[in-house]
């Protein structure tokens, strides 16, 4: 209440002091509520996945309000706080991006509930941030530095998230210890299959829609899969299985390359005729 009263008193003063106070106000509150929720989760003996969800939930809520209900965050300054919208959103997404990347490397247990891919607290939180990020990239408040890279950033984040979901599925369903999951043969084979599916989808969709960038991304991912088969999976699969995997890869690339040829390059502007 004292904080609200202070903001109301600063409303009439205007200027940078009032905006800075309200800016800090909307950073303090998600921190306080998130820490309180984490403390409750610890004393309730909830697993780490729940604790992370409760820690980040207030930040996600504040970020969503900044995208869809800005007037709620702008009060009591109202229009005077509008110049801070882009900076506040950038701060929110910057902090959440660091937490998101860190959370990809956590086991993310959902106890006492069973772990289900995507439908678990940690990955639902990660997915929520991806959705908010997609919405942010379509707004005018997106920093100019990020605008040329928004498609690549979203694609890279989606790829990392799907890879993380795959590794977590191996960890829980194949009973592979999380610290050594990347060195496990089942995990590496699973990544090969998932990456191949993503590469084929990129190939096909890029060809059907005439999006050369998407088609090239699929082709690059399939090249990564080939390198992975040569350097990693062959040792895990053995000679016979390794040879079979190469044959299957070659047939897959041949069929997909025939059905989904490269889209034409973008037409270059015609040269002006010289007099």
Please report, for each region that a protein language model flagged, where it lies by residue.
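Alpha-helical transmembrane segments of multi-pass membrane proteins
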Residues: 1-275
